[in-house]
Amino acid sequence: MKHIRNFSIIAHIDHGKSTLSDRLIQVCGGLSDREMAEQVLDSMDLERERGITIKAQSVTLDYTAKDGQTYQLNFIDTPGHVDFAYEVSRSLAACEGALLVVDAGQGVEAQTLANCYTAIEMDLEVVPILNKIDLPAAEPERVAEEIEDIVGIDAIDAVRCSAKTGVGVDEVLEKIVSAIPAPQGDPDAPLQALIIDSWFDNYLGVVSLVRIKNGSLKKNDKIKVMSTGQTWGVDRLGIFTPKQVDTDSLDTGEVGWVVCGIKDIMGAPVGDTLTLAKNGCEKALPGFKKVKPQVYAGLFPVSSDDYDNFRDALGKLSLNDASLFYEPETSAALGFGFRCGFLGMLHMEIIQERLEREYDLDLITTAPTVVYEVLKTNKEIVYVDSPAKLPAINDIEEIREPIARCNILVPADYLGNVITLCIEKRGTQVDMVYHGNQVALTYDIPMAEVVLDFFDRLKSTSRGYASLDYGFQRFEMSHMVRVDVLLNGDKVDALAIITHRDNSQTRGRQLVEKMKEFIPRQMFDIAIQAAIGNHIIARSTVKQLRKNVLAKCYGGDVSRKKKLLKKQKEGKKRMKQIGNVELPQEAFLAILHVGKD
């Protein structure tokens, strides 16, 4: 057991986590050169395309150190994006140490900082590593000072390496062996195994990734899931060397996968504890804190026949992604679907894309909203995650919107732009600290503004140098109103948005103009209106298509023309009474792009 090292890699997006993990696998011979693909651990097509890590993956490698001993390295790759922070905290719970990878050209970024603090709170040994030293822009000395200054860990003798060229990778491995402590635990105690992750395999049922804290797990053991109390027999277990390899047992301190023939998706929730059915452990391991979704949106299948498949797909996906929340919802405009909760806009896009790719579904998404706390006049407090659920205006005493605490790291040159952006997003400054050339800004900004397009705007005003980390802070009283969209006088529930009263006029006008571009012209006028309560704040009209009925009159009497025009007008009027408006999917997405261009 003293030869086991469990660690994960934490870093900001694009600082080279996945490339470094490729090198570690290659050096330790986990895969032959033929099987090496770029970013081995990003196994989802989506991850490769976008170049981001979404799911945490685990690998077991054997490394023969310079002292002649062979060490078993269990290494868990983690995502770097703010929307996937929960994946990181899960991975860290299974480790004793973490490699903090920092790009020697870019320096410390907000995300690195947030994940690093998570690791330090969990009492992990954090080992700084300066990556990308092969780049001409690399300044390892400056960055090492920056790490000490901002993060506060000792970085003078940080390993300098380049994952791309392979320089310094051996030093990284030596450092892992020397700096990261061996796992604690009692091999003879009753089994305690923490479920780090699970996913659904069509042949095997639920596959769980576990970290054995105490005791050991063997093939054919009878095990019990602590939260549900159900017992199962272990069919297969093993490790990943990125490939799934079967073994006969998993011992204390090891990380591996287990298949127990669980067919029910909720049978082995992430963060749960496994123990033996006979003389098992008394109490469960402390799991992970449940993450609360920050952004909600309605997802509806385009054809209602897909509803059942959609429900199954969401079930399988939520097993694999513990932070996805969903409940059934019906909409007058879109039929049956689900209200889903996500951690942020990127998470929402990824989930939608995974549903469409992996499960062949066509989906319509409604505009994302955050959760509002509403105090009603009868002093009851309700939480509203969709504009349709907002109580009537005269029942509302006050609406409180969620405020996010944003930590922004930005080079001093771009400070002005970023502050202007924060003020435009109704932010209030909390703190501002200079670290050398970097400035650490802390702002309280309404969550609704942050999740919509704050991240994109922040990147563009600072030419990509600013980085952001945010978390929910509190609810605060605010003047929010619901803007409804009416088509020919009928409300379309799926198009309503909740926005701040100061922005409601402009948002309403932009929305109406945007919708006008997307609704195809029909045989009669379509009036698109935005309203707050009964008060119309903006309107635009999609003009009708009309036939030129006067084409056959040459010269002639004006009363003849009047008669033909009047006849056409009456026909159009009749049409309008029975006609209904077809809304294309783009019209629903128009809401997302309001105010972007």
Curated annotation (Swiss-Prot):
Keywords: Cell inner membrane, Cell membrane, GTP-binding, Hydrolase, Membrane, Nucleotide-binding, Protein biosynthesis
Domain tr-type G: 2-184
Chief site of localization: membrane
Cell compartments where the protein resides: Cell inner membrane
Binding site for GTP: 14-19, 131-134
GO molecular function, one term: guanosine tetraphosphate binding
Topology term for the membrane: Peripheral membrane protein
UniProt GO cellular component terms: plasma membrane
EC number: 3.6.5.n1
Catalytic activity: GTP + H2O = GDP + phosphate + H(+)
GO annotation, biological process: positive regulation of translation
Family: Belongs to the TRAFAC class translation factor GTPase superfamily. Classic translation factor GTPase family. LepA subfamily.
PANTHER family, per the entry: TRANSLATION FACTOR GUF1 HOMOLOG, CHLOROPLASTIC (PTHR43512:SF4), TRANSLATION FACTOR GUF1-RELATED (PTHR43512)
Protein name per UniProt: Elongation factor 4
Protein's organism: Vibrio cholerae serotype O1 (strain ATCC 39315 / El Tor Inaba N16961)
